[in-house]
Amino acid sequence: MAKGIIGKKLGMTQIFDDDGNVIPVTVVQAGPCVVIQKKVEERDGYNALQVGFEDVPEHRVNKPLKGHFERAGVKPKKHVKEFMDFPEDLNEGDEITVDIFEEGELVDVTGISKGKGFAGTIKRWNFSRGPMSHGSRFHRAPGSIGAVDASRVFKGQKLPGRMGHDRVTIQNLEVVRVDSEKNLLLIKGSVPGPNKGILTIREAVKKASNA
């Protein structure tokens, strides 16, 4: 069974290993999370574990959600996510902490990437620019966006538009350190999104053989 937790990106720093090598790490406040609902195939049509993270004042929660949290006997949570693959011994009201992960373990981290705003094709899709002088009138334009015969622009054509703010998953990141007292995970490398962005950390699906 896979394991997972919801966390918040706090920022990046660096630590040193036993040989004095610098390791860039992202500090993530992972949990503590609480199980809100355990969904089973017989009743809900599929098996999943609904998990909540970060307390929120009761007056900020509408009545249906308030009743949902009360049934589980937990405080209202700001962020709620479902994990499809989960340990069967977890039940409603149980707490999930960083202790589910170990140092050296590989994880997949999912988050919302930083929004860049409206961007052209050079920045957004890495297009090459045209000549900048010698009479050229083609500098940073996208060029042709389709053929004459189709008389339309095909779906998926790379064009200028809003860049970033996409759901991104980075696979096979190493857990360098686990701090159980402060609920912190130190993950090697960078993870998607800005500081204070919400992340989902799961056990790696495609474990790299050379990692």
Curated annotation (Swiss-Prot):
One of its GO terms (cellular component) is cytosolic large ribosomal subunit. InterPro entries: Ribosomal_uL3 (IPR000597), Ribosomal_uL3_bac/org-type (IPR019927), Ribosomal_uL3_CS (IPR019926), Transl_B-barrel_sf (IPR009000). Pfam families: Ribosomal_L3 (PF00297). Keywords: Ribonucleoprotein, Ribosomal protein, RNA-binding, rRNA-binding. PROSITE patterns: RIBOSOMAL_L3 (PS00474). The keyword Ribonucleoprotein applies. GO terms for biological process: translation. One of its GO terms (molecular function) is rRNA binding. Part of the 50S ribosomal subunit. Forms a cluster with proteins L14 and L19. Belongs to the universal ribosomal protein uL3 family. One of the primary rRNA binding proteins, it binds directly near the 3'-end of the 23S rRNA, where it nucleates assembly of the 50S subunit. This is Large ribosomal subunit protein uL3. It comes from Halothermothrix orenii (strain H 168 / OCM 544 / DSM 9562). The lineage of its organism: Bacteria, Bacillati, Bacillota, Clostridia, Halanaerobiales. The gene is rplC.
